[in-house]
Amino acid sequence: GEVGEPAQLPERARDMSDPAHAGNRLFTEARGHLQQMGPQSGLRSQQELDNTAGALALSAQKAGMSRIDHVVAGTDGRALFAVQGVMGDPAMQRSMVQREAAAQLPLEQSSQQLAAEASSRQEQTASVIREQDQNRPRSL
């Protein structure tokens, strides 16, 4: 871009399917697990699959997860859970989306929300590090 322009994400990183997007890893993992579920996922099209993978990635990001090891359907089939860790392990982390709502959430929208969430988390981490730095006793 031109010098002096505000820094922006490259146009091609518009959604999580792009490797340059902050949510790409979570999206790719969610999508792979949804594809493995096949008809059990309840998703009717490629677009619903991508939308749901994006929604799962966003909910996992908000839950502080760094990866999605499993995607499982709730007992009633209406909810989908993203799981980080070993199934049944008390330390596993999980996040949940309602399947119908997730299937209708445009991938671009969940991608923008995840990117915003990721950058605000980086800011928080940076400010915590600065505070720790300021609070450290100075040695003579």
Model-flagged regions — what are they?
Residues G1-L140:
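Gram-negative host-targeted secretion-system effectors, predominantly Type III and Type IV
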